[in-house]
């Protein structure tokens, strides 16, 4: 078993994603980003571990699910206080924290972009600088 697939390593992957994707967001937004990652783990459309969800597509051009994993920058935690905060959030969520902020979202993006993929999904919430989405319900045709 690879280290990143071990259960006790999953909180580290979640904390890292929260730090690099949402550390400047309000706490509510950080929890919502954690929900997206955990909602993906629970979905059959995504990998079944936090580390695999976070790193999905890394190394493939335009395939990263989380931009920090493919931006070409060295990822270094420079703000210890912010990291401690996201570690606590990660641990709460991994230990069964209630998922009620994102509206069941499995996707999000920053408000500074308008990706074409977002049109295919239902917007559930905007928190801070992130817009959250879930798969759109298909209407039945008569």
Predicted regions span which residues?
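Bacterial extracytoplasmic/cell-wall-associated proteins, especially those involved in peptidoglycan
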Residues: 1-142
